[in-house]
Structures are given as C-alpha cells and as structure tokens.
C-alpha cells in the first residue's frame, strides 16, 4: 500500500513523501551507471592504447581455458580517475605456462619471483608483472608458501584489502568478489577476513594499511583528527 506517498491534484501526481528518497536512489543508479561506463571504457582504452593488448593476446589464446585480467593499482587508479603508471596482471596459467605463452609471441620476460608465481614481461621498455593465481599454504608473518590455483575467488581471498581484490578483463568487465570498488569509492580500507589474522600472516600488511590510509585524499581526515585532539587538550589546560 503506497497511496500515502502521492497526492492527486488536477490530474497531476505529485510525490509528497518519498520524493527525496526516490531522487537520491535514481541519482545513485545513474551515477553508478555512468561511473561504470567510465571505468569500462578506460580499461578498454588501457588495453588498446598500451602494449598490454599483446600480453592479453598471448595468454588468452594459449589454451581454451587460459585467462588474464588486470588487478591491483591500475584498476584502483582508473576507478579513482587517476593516471595509471603501472599495470599488474593476474592469470590462471602457471609461471611455466606464462613463460611458454610469452615465448610463442616473442615477448621478452624475466622471472621476478617465480616461487610466488610472478613473471615480468617487457614490451617497448614497459614492464608488466604477471602473477599466477594462488593460495597460501603456510605463512610465518613475513613469507608465505603458495600453491598455484585456478580459482579467481581463491586468489582474491588471499589478498590483503578488498580494494586490492578487484579484477577486470580487457573489455572492462569487473570481477569484484569482496566489494572493493564500493570500499574504494567510499574511502574505506577493509581487510579481507579477520584483520588480526591477515596481519599475523604478513606483518607488513599493517604498514600497507597505514600507507593506504594516508593517501592524499584522506590526509584532511588525519589533520582534522589531530586538530581536534589538540583542541581538546587545550581546553583542559
């Protein structure tokens, strides 16, 4: 029963209660649509306007099931409408398969950290880190022993923060199992899983948390907090 939301006057329907809510809802829907179009188009541009398209071709055509996606900083920066200065990729191929795929397309590469599944491809002096999907087998607070995986969500689950677990194919279709885009747009930094457990797995994660928290667009929050604390202390002198 929603008749209480409307008043009929001279054949005109006017929303009395609920108009601000509906307007806000529609604004959010259209904003998300426009924003998603912007993200999709810029990820497509990133593929078409950089040598990354050669890596996508090499890895996506390696086998019937092979796939490579953008991950990490390049997606964060596109969502935040910042300049992309590096490109990281994730793939369901093993490191040896990545090397084989790159060789077949005459793409130069070197093994950056093959024990953790990372190969660096070099095209026109640009470097692209390609990391195989994996899951942690054991951790000691700094180093992790990993096992390669075919599961994208399993790979996402081992990452530190939701904003680092956003993937995209070359067409700009996002895979975001932990709502990292939403957190990024709202300025939230959330650990994946229990924060205490994630920090125990790798103690450097707390430093990365601080680094993300102190990004330029958040500095005013820190300054306001410090000023507020100073003001409170001054009042009690």
Per-range role (PLM):
Residues 22-237:
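Catalytic cores of the polymerase beta-like nucleotidyltransferase superfamily
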